[in-house]
């Protein structure tokens, strides 16, 4: 039994290979035949694989596999390259047959030099390590140990291996005999098949539709650089907050209420509950934890909004929210500037260490911030809007919460152009009017630069969870960060008075009822339990929300959100 297993683990070659090799009528394999990837050959190969699946998909726990590799020290491609590639003097361009190594990886390419020497480029995906690229294997008939039968079937066995197969290579470090003297693993045993590929990869994949429909093939052909950068960004976000003694928590995703942001929720049910909603933001749960006694909390996770999908929006997306006690709006702005400096400087080092290409927008952002001493540009909401419109929205006699007064204060040409249905003010809220004015006259005109721009002191009607400015009751201690016209961050001093919070919730509900447009306001159910919880005492607290997917788009220089999601948007996911 052990002998049989050992032969299987050593060869893992199809039986038809052994039979054909014994035949005196077998013709020598030409180079063209050795690398043939025709459908006929793939079909024949797959037929043999299907007949003996255990042989071509062995368990890594198989005893024969361990017995065979006892003399060999298992290392990764990165370990091998770091030890020998970075220090060629270690080997002095000489083979070292006394150092036996075992390396697992995937075949990237196979090249035959006659019938007795095979060159294999082995790689192991991409872990983001500088030396974790690939390694050349040299499989030379004259240096392969084992039985005479193994050596007799060398050509047949090596021709069975194809691009995409996973193998275990056994050998010692050395160099090719060419003038280049390329560092290689000189195999002294035939490579062991760990898993085979049954579908050949296309030579390239550039069509966007096909990329969206098969991300697995896309990553194999075009690389996983975006995934690596995204993973590093999330790791750095955690490190920044962990280093400042924030506590990471997980709050409910499924509950009977999804309050916390202006969005339409996904509604579902379960065996035990008739009405459940997916969260649209973790905000109110995180603030409950602040009330419970935690000083600094954060959560990185998914939120869900039942709204449209476009280049910057998906139905599910990742956010970071953190809350810190005793923080003013200016303190949160400073914290945000520090966060961007930390992210960008550490990502710059990551790009250097991994030799990944530095995206253009990342370089531009790095330059813009470093030249401005890592400070953001600031634009105040109402004063800037006044200047753009040539009016005074801060007039003490004007109530911007009333749509009729707000529309009347606008220049006639502006009102006619952007609010043609102005006469029917019952269907148009101040929230909608101010959002439109902000989009046209603030975001489009003042937030298009690479240098991050802060719009601050948003009107109270736009900010139901934010603290009111003590100097001007019509605005709040809130700010948003824009880069090249897109919003990335929303932050503010949190309302901590239960009575005022309830008033703001009721005001939002009233707007809901007047406009009949629930997609632009809070979920219609007021969270009275949250208001009641506030009465136990809520300290002054600053809150911060960041869209991680958009940040990844910015740092990776991607135009669409699906490009930074592992499997794209919902419609892409449904096709895979």
UniProtKB/Swiss-Prot annotation:
GO cellular component terms listed in the entry, alphabetical order: cytoplasm; mitochondrial matrix; mitochondrion
Subcellular localization: Mitochondrion matrix
Any GO BP annotation: lysyl-tRNA aminoacylation
Class of this enzyme: ligase
GO molecular function, one term: tRNA binding
A matching Pfam family: tRNA-synt_2
EC number per UniProt: 6.1.1.6
Catalyzed reaction equations: tRNA(Lys) + L-lysine + ATP = L-lysyl-tRNA(Lys) + AMP + diphosphate
UniProt xrefs under InterPro entries: Aa-tRNA-synt_II, aa-tRNA-synth_II, aa-tRNA-synth_II/BPL/LPL, Lys-tRNA-ligase_II, Lys-tRNA-ligase_II_N, Lys-tRNA-synth_II_C, NA-bd_OB-fold
Top-rank taxon: Eukaryota
Transit peptide feature, positions: 1-30
Keywords: Aminoacyl-tRNA synthetase, ATP-binding, Ligase, Mitochondrion, Nucleotide-binding, Protein biosynthesis, Transit peptide
Cross-referenced NCBIfam families: lysS_bact
Additional record remark: Present with 2280 molecules/cell in log phase SD medium.
Family listed: Belongs to the class-II aminoacyl-tRNA synthetase family.
Physiological role: Catalyzes the attachment of lysine to tRNA(Lys) in the mitochondrion.
Name assigned to this protein: Lysine--tRNA ligase, mitochondrial
Species in which this protein is naturally found: Saccharomyces cerevisiae (strain ATCC 204508 / S288c) (Baker's yeast)
High-level lineage: Eukaryota, Fungi, Dikarya, Ascomycota, Saccharomycotina
């Amino acid at each position: 039994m052990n002998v049989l297993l050992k032969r299987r683990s050593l060869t893992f070659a199809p039986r038809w290979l052994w039979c054909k090799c014994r035949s005196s009528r077998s013709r020598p394999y030409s180079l063209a035949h050795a690398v043939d990837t025709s459908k006929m050959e793939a079909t024949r190969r797959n037929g043999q694989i299907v007949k003996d699946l255990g042989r071509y998909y062995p368990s890594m726990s198989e005893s024969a596999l361990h017995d065979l590799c006892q003399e060999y020290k298992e290392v990764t491609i990165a370990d091998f390259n770091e030890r020998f590639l970075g220090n060629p003097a270690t080997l002095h361009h000489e083979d070292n047959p006394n150092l036996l190594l075992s390396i697992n990886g995937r075949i990237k390419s196979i090249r035959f030099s006659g019938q007795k020497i095979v060159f294999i480029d082995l790689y192991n995906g991409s872990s983001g390590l500088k030396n974790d690229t690939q390694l050349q294997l040299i499989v030379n008939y004259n240096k392969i140990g084992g039985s005479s039968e193994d050596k007799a079937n060398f050509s047949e066995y090596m021709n069975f291996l194809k691009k995409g197969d996973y193998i275990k290579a056994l050998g010692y470090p050395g160099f090719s005999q060419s003038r280049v003297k390329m560092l290689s693993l000189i195999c002294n045993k035939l490579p062991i098949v760990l898993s085979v590929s049954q579908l050949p990869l296309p030579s390239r994949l550039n069509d966007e539709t096909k990329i969206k429909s098969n991300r697995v093939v896309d990553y194999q052909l075009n690389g996983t650089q975006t995934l690596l950068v995204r993973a590093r960004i999330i790791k750095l976000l955690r490190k920044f907050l962990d280093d400042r003694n924030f506590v990471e928590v997980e709050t409910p995703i499924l509950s009977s209420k999804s309050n916390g942001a202006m969005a339409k929720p996904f509604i579902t049910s379960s065996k035990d509950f008739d009405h459940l909603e997916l969260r649209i933001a973790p905000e109110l749960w995180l603030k409950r934890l602040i009330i419970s006694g935690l000083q600094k909390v954060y959560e990185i996770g998914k939120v869900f909004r039942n709204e449209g999908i476009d280049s910057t929006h998906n139905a599910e997306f990742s956010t970071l929210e953190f809350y810190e006690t005793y923080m003013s709006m200016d303190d949160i702005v400073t914290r945000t500037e520090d966060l961007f400096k930390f992210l960008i400087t550490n990502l710059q080092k990551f790009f250097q260490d991994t030799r990944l290409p530095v995206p253009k927008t990342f370089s531009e952002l790095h330059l813009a911030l470093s030249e401005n001493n890592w400070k953001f540009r600031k634009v105040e909401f109402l004063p800037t809007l006044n200047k753009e419109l040539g009016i005074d929205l801060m007039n003490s006699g004007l109530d911007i919460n009333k749509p009729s007064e707000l529309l009347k204060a606008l220049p006639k040409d502006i009102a006619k152009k952007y609010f043609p249905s102005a006469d029917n003010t019952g269907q148009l809220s101040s929230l909608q009017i101010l959002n439109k004015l902000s989009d046209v006259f603030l975001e489009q005109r003042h937030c298009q630069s690479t240098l991050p721009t802060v719009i601050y002191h948003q009107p109270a009607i736009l900010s139901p969870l934010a603290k009111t400015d003590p100097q001007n009751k019509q605005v709040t201690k809130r700010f948003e960060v824009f880069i090249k016209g897109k919003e990335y961050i929303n932050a503010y001093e949190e309302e901590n008075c239960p009575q005022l919070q309830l008033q703001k919730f009721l005001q939002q509900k009233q707007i809901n009822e007047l406009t009949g447009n629930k997609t632009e306001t809070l979920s219609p159910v007021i969270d009275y339990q949250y208001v009641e919880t506030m009465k136990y005492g809520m300290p002054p607290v600053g809150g911060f929300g960041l869209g991680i997917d958009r940040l990844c788009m910015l740092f990776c220089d991607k135009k669409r959100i699906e490009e930074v999601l592992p499997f794209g948007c919902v419609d892409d996911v449904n096709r895979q």
